[in-house]
Amino acid sequence: VYDRWRNTNNNSLVVKVSFGNASFLFPGDIMAEAEKELVELAGADLACTVLLVPHHGSRSSSTQSFLATVQPEIAVISAGWKNRFRFPHPTVLQAYQKEGCRILRTDRQGAITISTDGDQLTVAPFILSDDPPGAD
């Protein structure tokens, strides 16, 4: 049997949640191949206010086409502090910065809570500094 998604990361469930004028896109660990297909199938419907950055900020995701389509205001990167993969990748950070996104990172800010009333977003990182835990 031919598996068009040879990497199981591309089988991740992708969910978009909308409430009023706010929307959140959770693309799991998808990679460039799945991003391309999503852009082709959903197009502008992928646009969101908050994006959980695909695959923890791996350079195998967050293609220019995907970012241009999704156009997030806030990009949240879920990555462990000093993780062995060194996520997020510097080129991914640069891509989101170039798009003008506010970047939040769990490796630096710990748990991040984002809530909305449908119009305004409230962002509450556990650690208010951009310095990673234990930094002196």
Language-model regions, residue ranges each:
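Core dinuclear metal-dependent hydrolase active-site scaffold
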Residues: V1-V50, R108-D136
